[in-house]
């Protein structure tokens, strides 16, 4: 298992909230919780930035963190990420903040400690481009957006 450095930004993590953790032994994502003083209401169509109370430093250039929505929040309540996906670069050292967007028809209340998103770590391959005049032809070619249906 890879070790990632985490810094506690908000001391309530020790007393009232938890560090991100896997819900099950087969979980791909670590649950991120809302580090709030009091419940926060997100009205339909609105977004809010929510603190997690922690910062991470991945440091390994071959790994990135990805913040993803929790499927149940999106399906049941219309709560998704305001930026759809949050990408955490290996050299970022700031606090993890989650942008929640209520795309549902009803207000949604985020309670302190509520699991609001998940953090997944992924391998990264950095590339460099080689400029060419043409590509070797393939069966698909340049056809996109629904061409392979």
UniProtKB/Swiss-Prot annotation:
The protein's Enzyme Commission number: 3.6.1.23
Annotated residues for binding of substrate: 70-72, 83, 87-89
Signal sequence, start to end: none
Coiled coil stretches, renumbered: none
Gene3D superfamilies referenced in this protein's UniProt entry, alphabetically: 2.70.40.10
Pathway: Pyrimidine metabolism; dUMP biosynthesis; dUMP from dCTP (dUTP route): step 2/2
Known function: This enzyme is involved in nucleotide metabolism: it produces dUMP, the immediate precursor of thymidine nucleotides and it decreases the intracellular concentration of dUTP so that uracil cannot be incorporated into DNA.
Catalysed conversion reaction: dUTP + H2O = dUMP + diphosphate + H(+)
Sorted UniProt keywords: Hydrolase, Magnesium, Metal-binding, Nucleotide metabolism
GO BP, sorted A to Z: dUMP biosynthetic process; dUTP catabolic process
CDD domains linked to this entry: trimeric_dUTPase
GO molecular function: dUTP diphosphatase activity; magnesium ion binding
Superkingdom to which the source organism belongs: Bacteria
Broad class of enzyme this protein falls into: hydrolase
Originating species: Blochmanniella pennsylvanica (strain BPEN)
Cofactor(s), names only, from the UniProt record: Mg(2+)
Similarity annotation: Belongs to the dUTPase family.
The protein, known as: Deoxyuridine 5'-triphosphate nucleotidohydrolase
InterPro entries: dUTPase, dUTPase-like, dUTPase-like_sf, dUTPase_trimeric
